[in-house]
Amino acid sequence: MKKKWTLEETKMLFKKPFFNLMFQAQEEHRKNFDPNTIQISTLLSIKTGSCPEDCKYCPQSSRYKTGLKKEPLLEIEQILSAAKKAKDSGSSRFCMGAAWKNPKEKDMPYLEKIIKKIKEMGMETCMTLGTLNSTQAKKLADAGLDFYNHNLDTSKNFYSNIITTRTYQERLHTLHAVRSSGMKVCSGGIIGLGEKKQDRIELLMELSNLSIQPESVPINMLVKIPGTPMADNKDVEPFDFIRIIAVARIMMPKSYIRLSAGRHKMNDQTQAMCFMAGANSIFYGCKLLTSDNPEEKHDLELFKKLDLIPENKTQTLLKEDEYKNIIKSSKIKKDQYYNAAII
């Protein structure tokens, strides 16, 4: 039977001495994963900007003047070309995001065709398209979609300070529709929205106490975009962020914990500590939605320093020429990639 985390138990994890917490998280990580491998995903915007929602952190909202260039739906061939390059660069999962409140029925054949084509390449697929009903979720699942991303963002109590155009319960209903369809769930949150420690505790409790824990949990650090209401929020203290990663690993031991948006603001030492705390997945590529992502070459150099191997590569250290070949093949158009915090 899955453990149900209580408020007191979760608070106690946050109160643990830092190194004791790190030790426990690393122990839990090693029970369930190879500590020297990392899962790599690439995220592509298939429709950018003009979103009707009012998420206060998001440059894709039509309500804020952020200078984001609006783009229509990409052609299928453009998407397939990007997916091939992502696979050649070491990604095992191709994620696609559209700036919608929810997909329309007219969009479903387009989405289903993309999923089937990318699956033929041998990659896992993930989409983030906004709210889904059960019929839409079933169609995506039948097309072969492996994961659906729908973040909770923050705690139920703090949520209305961030978003008013979609309720917390609607998010939970979408996650239920995704799970019921047979797809895997990708759901996490954003740190740095102005939330208190209690909100971080409640967010991790909500995620870990879902009927089945998410297979993938992206932990985003707020990317402060000029023009959004959160452009001047305080920076997140790195050790607070590392602590959240560690607690997430302990509470969701079999989930992939992903370093997502905001990673470009972290130095190598902070990222290494996050990996030590149990993070074992990243978004790799030029851009995440609308914010910078660390350059591919730098990522691969960091992997080499830490002896981390992409999950779909051989489980031995890559040789120098293998790293160079991956770097060479990773040149993808930067204007197609965007920020995971907005999904």
UniProtKB/Swiss-Prot annotation:
InterPro entries: Aldolase_TIM, BATS_dom, Biotin_synth/BioAB, Biotin_synthase, Elp3/MiaA/NifB-like_rSAM, rSAM
EC top class, as a word: transferase
Catalysed transformations (reactions): (4R,5S)-dethiobiotin + (sulfur carrier)-SH + 2 reduced [2Fe-2S]-[ferredoxin] + 2 S-adenosyl-L-methionine = (sulfur carrier)-H + biotin + 2 5'-deoxyadenosine + 2 L-methionine + 2 oxidized [2Fe-2S]-[ferredoxin]
Cofactor: [4Fe-4S] cluster; [2Fe-2S] cluster
Positions of [4Fe-4S] cluster binding: C51, C55, C58
EC nos: 2.8.1.6
Keywords: 2Fe-2S, 4Fe-4S, Biotin biosynthesis, Iron, Iron-sulfur, Metal-binding, S-adenosyl-L-methionine, Transferase
Gene3D superfamilies the record matches: Aldolase class I
Binding-site positions, [2Fe-2S] cluster: C95, C126, C186, R258
Cofactor note: Binds 1 [4Fe-4S] cluster. The cluster is coordinated with 3 cysteines and an exchangeable S-adenosyl-L-methionine. Binds 1 [2Fe-2S] cluster. The cluster is coordinated with 3 cysteines and 1 arginine.
CDD domains linked to this entry: Radical_SAM
BP terms from Gene Ontology: biotin biosynthetic process
Residue stretches making up the Radical SAM core domain: 36-254
Recorded superkingdom: Bacteria
MF term (GO), any: biotin synthase activity
Biochemical pathway: Cofactor biosynthesis; biotin biosynthesis; biotin from 7,8-diaminononanoate: step 2/2
Similarity comment text for this entry: Belongs to the radical SAM superfamily. Biotin synthase family.
Subunit structure, interactors included: Homodimer.
Cross-referenced NCBIfam families: bioB (TIGR00433)
Function noted in UniProt: Catalyzes the conversion of dethiobiotin (DTB) to biotin by the insertion of a sulfur atom into dethiobiotin via a radical-based mechanism.
Protein name: Biotin synthase
Classification of source organism: Bacteria, Pseudomonadati, Pseudomonadota, Gammaproteobacteria, Enterobacterales
